[in-house]
């Protein structure tokens, strides 16, 4: 978000989270007359937390009408919580909410670069006027249509993700690591601050085992690693490696 904001000579304003979750009150306090767009990743990356539909409604109600609220639901398909919504109701209720989604996550088409948006016609008209011609290739469109038809794959990916996320969380917390609740296809793992067992040392150890995770220093979480949920063999290898590291 900061990169695309600066591309149009705008000023990005980061809003602090509360307990690793977006804070509606902090968002509203940060809004000024100059605010044009509010971007919210829901579920959030890299924490895996989310705002409920009621909190989203409270956020939209507290924003000035001139502020466009953009809900990035890249990980929405992984969420099974009853109080979650990607924002369809908010788009339907007004003319200043945009919902964006991607085929890069649960559909496994990250390299295809295909996404979509549900938004007011006026917003779609602006996007159509500024987008590049032929911005979505025929191959990407074909891949997207095939992915939408393969509902069995999506259902299995969702079930496997829930099972292995819970299993991985249980194993890692058993090693004394902190793993905040996640509704996405990854977990945020927080490590001790001592040099021998901190996140940097854990990352290096995992790399020596051929396991790649994501360092979180750039997100303001230098004590953490983000670990994607894969298949059982991959998660077993990860757990075994971290068991060795923590011992």
Please tell me what each predicted stretch does.
Residues 1-10:
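Substrate-binding/gating loop at the entrance of the active-site cleft, primarily
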Residues 6, 22-34, 46-69, 73-106:
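Active-site pre-lysine segment of PLP-dependent enzymes
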Residues 162, 166, 173-209, 225, ...:
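Conserved PLP-binding catalytic core of the aspartate aminotransferase-like
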Residues 37-41, 70, 116-118:
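Structural motif
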Residues 13-19:
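Short beta->alpha connector loops at strand-helix junctions that form conserved
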Residues 54, 201-204, 208-209, 214, ...:
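PLP-dependent enzyme catalytic core of the Aspartate aminotransferase-like
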């Amino acid at each position: 978000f900061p990169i695309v904001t600066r591309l149009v000579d705008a000023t990005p304003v980061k809003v602090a989270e509360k307990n690793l979750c977006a804070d509606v009150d902090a968002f509203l306090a940060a809004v000024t007359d100059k605010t044009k767009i509010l971007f919210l990743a829901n579920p959030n990356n890299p924490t895996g937390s989310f705002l409920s539909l009621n909190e989203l409604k409270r956020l939209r109600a507290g924003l000035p009408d001139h502020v466009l609220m953009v809900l990035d639901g890249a990980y929405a398909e992984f969420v099974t919580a009853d109080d979650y919504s990607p924002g369809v109701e908010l788009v339907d209720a007004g003319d200043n909410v945009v919902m964006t989604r991607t085929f890069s996550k649960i559909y496994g088409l990250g390299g295809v670069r295909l996404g979509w948006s549900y938004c007011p016609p006026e917003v779609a008209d602006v996007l159509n006027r500024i987008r590049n011609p032929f911005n979505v290739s025929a191959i990407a469109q074909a891949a997207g249509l095939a992915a939408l038809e393969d509902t069995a794959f999506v259902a299995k990916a969702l079930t496997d993700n829930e099972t292995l996320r819970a299993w991985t969380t249980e194993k890692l917390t058993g090693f004394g690591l902190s793993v905040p609740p996640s509704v996405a296809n990854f977990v945020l793992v927080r490590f001790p601050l001592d040099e021998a067992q901190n996140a940097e040392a854990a990352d290096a150890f995992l790399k020596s085992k051929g396991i790649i995770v994501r360092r979180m220093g750039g997100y303001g979480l230098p004590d953490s690693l983000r670990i994607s949920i894969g298949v059982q063999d991959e998660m077993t290898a990860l757990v075994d490696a971290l068991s060795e590291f923590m011992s």
